[in-house]
């Protein structure tokens, strides 16, 4: 099992430090090139356990997963350019996004924090703060990735 209280506590730390309307934590499953939702502030719209494979533009995967760098979309145009679910994102009054990779031992990508708020809510300082908080998700994601990898090898 993941540690939902840990991820919920991380959500609160993000809320207190930079603000957030929509917060999800996704585990990276390399064997399937899929992102598996481990935590969601909006479980009706973004249910825990949901997976994304082709919803995200290749440039985003190159940046966040391959290069292990944050993605920053300051406004709705940037969100629309990258995310297929931009209409749902906009319906939640989110127009600015920070995606931060969560790294494990050996700089292996364990997953991604998705932090969204109103347009122009974030800046370079927000990205730095988000990066500093990302390691707090590593224990829960490490456990989830290991469990999902074992399940995937049995199918």
Model-identified regions with their sequence ranges:
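A short, aliphatic-rich beta-strand micro-motif
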Residues: 96-103
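Juxtadomain coupling helices with adjacent low-complexity linkers
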Residues: 7, 117-155
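Regulatory sensory and allosteric helical modules in signal-transduction proteins
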Residues: 45-81, 90-93
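Amphipathic alpha-helical coiled-coil segments that mediate homodimerization
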Residues: 2-25
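Sensory-domain boundary capping and coupling elements
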Residues: 103-117
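GAF sensory/regulatory domain recognition
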Residues: 25-48
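Short hydrophobic/aromatic beta-strand element in the GNAT-like acyltransferase core
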Residues: 22, 86, 99, 112
């Amino acid at each position: 099992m993941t540690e939902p209280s840990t991820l919920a506590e991380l959500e609160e730390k993000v809320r207190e430090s930079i603000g957030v309307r929509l917060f999800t934590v996704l585990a990276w499953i390399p064997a399937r090139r899929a992102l598996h939702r481990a935590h969601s502030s909006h479980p009706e719209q973004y249910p825990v356990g949901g997976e994304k494979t082709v919803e995200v533009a290749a440039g985003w995967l190159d940046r966040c997963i391959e290069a292990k760098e944050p993605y920053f979309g300051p406004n709705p145009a940037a969100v629309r350019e990258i995310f297929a679910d931009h209409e749902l994102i906009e319906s939640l009054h989110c127009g600015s996004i920070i995606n931060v990779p969560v790294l494990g031992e050996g700089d292996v990508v364990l997953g991604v924090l998705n932090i969204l708020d109103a347009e122009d809510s974030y800046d370079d300082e927000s990205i730095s703060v988000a990066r500093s908080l990302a390691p707090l998700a590593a224990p829960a994601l490490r456990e989830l990735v290991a469990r999902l990898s074992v399940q995937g090898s049995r199918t």
